[in-house]
Amino acid sequence: MPTSLVTGGAGFIGAHVVNDLVALGHDVVVLDDLSGGFEDNVNPAATFIEGSVTDHVLVSRIFGEHDFDYVYHLAAY
């Protein structure tokens, strides 16, 4: 089963990408700081991590804990 990271996955477009990936059978991790999205938008089958893509320590930890096949960078600002 592929594993995907979606940054900005709590936003409008990101949440739809997450839903499609879950429907395709992916394990999905969402990284979002909720500055433009809402946690309620995140598919409950996905793992949600609240944080910023600018936090290099957090991003390094996430990549150390998961072996991603795909990364969808949809975070903005």
Residue ranges and their predicted role:
Residues 1-77:
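N-terminal Rossmann-like NAD(P)+-binding domain of SDR-like oxidoreductases, especially those catalyzing
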